[in-house]
């Protein structure tokens, strides 16, 4: 899936990944390739994907058409 992690100042990371781990408001969430569409609120924690780890304060993530877009405050 295509993954974009962005914050107000610009793109943090963009690329292809088979799995992304998100700090969802209701608990840790693992998103795999071809996941069903969703919109989820993120809490303070770490986003992990393709060998990178990004610490965030909060944000939202949405999946559609095998693209995961993550908008965060770091």
Where in this protein do the model-derived segments appear?
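Compact, glycine-rich, soluble single-domain proteins
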Residues: 2-74
């Amino acid at each position: 899936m295509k993954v974009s992690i962005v914050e107000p100042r610009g793109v943090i990371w963009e690329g292809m990944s088979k799995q992304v781990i998100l700090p969802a408001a209701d608990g840790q969430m693992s998103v795999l390739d071809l996941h069903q569409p969703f919109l989820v609120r993120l809490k303070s924690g770490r986003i992990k994907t393709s060998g990178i780890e990004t610490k965030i304060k909060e944000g939202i993530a949405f999946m559609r058409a095998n693209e995961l877009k993550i908008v965060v405050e770091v």
